[in-house]
Amino acid sequence: MKKFIREKFNSILRSEAHKAGVIPVQSPDDENQRLAEIERLGIMDRDLSGERKYNTMTQVASYLTGCKHTMINILESKIQQCKSSFGFNMIENTVIKEMPREISVCQYTLENPSQPLVIEDLWEDERTKNMSKMRGGALPSDFMQGLP
């Protein structure tokens, strides 16, 4: 998606999230260190969608969890980038490729960066249930597991 269109799309998503009552997570204490490590790895500038090891991880995650959709996402200071995904069609892949961090489900991994996060039911969990009120619904699945 062209940068201008992506920025407009993200602006609409932010507005929808605000109207729906989605509350962003505060940045963790080690945010600068976390972002410096992402920068050091150069991962935000790389397209990993064609790399076999990441595609295999998303496929295995789908198989093990029974989830139709799986993703590997990286949280930057303002955005979430999907680096590899499984089970999405071409349009869905375009939409999930980049989104505002403050409306992503993955942002909740930052609340407790020393622990994996498991949300059994995204539609009922207090942190994520308002996302379903966004036009088009922002929940790609019922379940989420994230690692900081």
Residue ranges and their predicted role:
Residues 68-69, 75-85, 90-145:
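Regulatory sensory and allosteric helical modules in signal-transduction proteins
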Residues 2-97:
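Intrinsically disordered, low-complexity terminal regulatory regions
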